Amino acid sequence: APPGNFATIDGAITHAQQSGFAIVNLFTAYTPLSRFRDAVGAEIIYLVLSHIAELDKFASTTVSGAATDTDCTLAIRVISTEADTLAQRPMGEIRALAESQGGTMDTNAQAGTWTLSVHLPLGESPPA
């Protein structure tokens, strides 16, 4: 069963670990995230993991970043022979989610490593 905190960044990572992903959690919430922002972060993690699972479920994955008073950054770094394949995917659903929250998404690939970074400003309320 999924953890009770399934819709949080930490819960998403815990669930992935329990599901067999080789994932390390280096995310730090210096400021507690609102339930809505935490759920958005969790959704981004689940979306990225769905891409990873299709290609290389055993890829070494690290989630880092932080939540502060003003923003939340998430960086999901994957070391895999499939890094170039990940880099060719537009990740449009993740970009759309980030941009719908006033944020941005970038990806970077080099030498067997692929990184997706999301920056979300804090303080906005969830859409009605």
Language-model segments: what does each one mean?
Residues P2-F6, L33, A67-D69:
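Conserved sequence/structural motifs within the catalytic ATP-binding
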Residues T70-R95, P127:
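Glycine-rich/acidic phosphate-handling loop/turn and adjacent ATP-lid/helix
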Residues F21-L49, A53:
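Conserved short strand/loop->alpha-helix "switch" segment adjacent to the catalytic nucleotide/phosphoryl-transfer site
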Residues V78, S117-E124:
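C-terminal beta-strand of the catalytic ATP-binding
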Residues A16-L26, S60, G103:
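Short conserved segments within the C-terminal catalytic ATPase subdomain
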Residues A1-A22, I45:
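Short beta-to-alpha transition helix within the HATPase_c
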Residues S60-I79, N108:
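Short beta-strand/loop element within the Bergerat-fold HATPase_c
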Residues Y46, S50, E54, D84-H119:
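ATP phosphate-binding glycine-rich loop and adjacent ATP-lid/helix-beta elements
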